[in-house]
Amino acid sequence: MNKKMMTGILAGILLLGGCTQNAAQPTASASAETEKNLNAEYTQLPEENAFYYLEKDGVETLILHGTGILYLGFPECPWCQAYVPQLNTVLLANEAKAAYYNIHTDKSEDRTFYDQIAKDIEDVNDTGNTIMQYDNDGKAVIYMPLVLFVKNGRVIAYNNETCMEDSSVIKPEAYWTEEKKSALQTALNKLVAEIKTAQKENEAKGCDNGCKVD
């Protein structure tokens, strides 16, 4: 056997070995996230922030089966821009992460998916309040900013403060007084801490339901 052939065989064995070793399998949400940084779209966010992008196929998985925090918004929304840094402050304080998805794009580009997500949210809604709004045709409308707190496939809480505000009436910077910022962060802190604890508990059990713990 010549030297070149022997080298090729050894390389093949090493490559095969690398594929069959005990590699950790990513969770549903972790495999769906990308490496983009949200501060490219949300200009008030620092580069080191607590958000990760969730692809379309991971959104329903997180809502129906996961444990985590899902932020729905879109960068053209001034209220979403103003909300994100406040949520980020709370997430960082709790060493937690939040998934981000721009559902607004799907309203025009993939209405079937948009409607399905709206239905999913209400189907697992344990908050006691209706999260969705409805237009004159009876179609669900997801008003944003909206942050969902999901625990084992149930929406246990949400926050959508300012989702109905009109920036032509009041600007976000005028609305968000220091008192309102403090009240929001107090409310969010309790919920973020609860989800973080649930994620750790699931991880300790060998969580395989789409939860994410960093």
Q: Can you name each region flagged by the protein language model?
A:
Residues 138-206, 210-211:
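Non-catalytic, surface beta->alpha helical segment in thiol-disulfide oxidoreductase systems
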Residues 15-18:
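C-terminal motif of bacterial Sec signal peptides marking the signal peptidase cleavage site
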Residues 1-5:
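Positively charged n-region of N-terminal signal peptides that target proteins for export
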Residues 81-94:
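Typically the conserved alpha-helix immediately C-terminal to a functionally engaged Cys/Sec
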Residues 20-22:
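Bacterial signal peptide processing site
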Residues 102-156:
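Thioredoxin-like thiol-disulfide oxidoreductase module
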Residues 48-67:
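A short beta-strand-turn-helix
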Residues 63-75, 87:
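Short active-site neighborhood of thiol/selenol oxidoreductases, capturing the structured segment around
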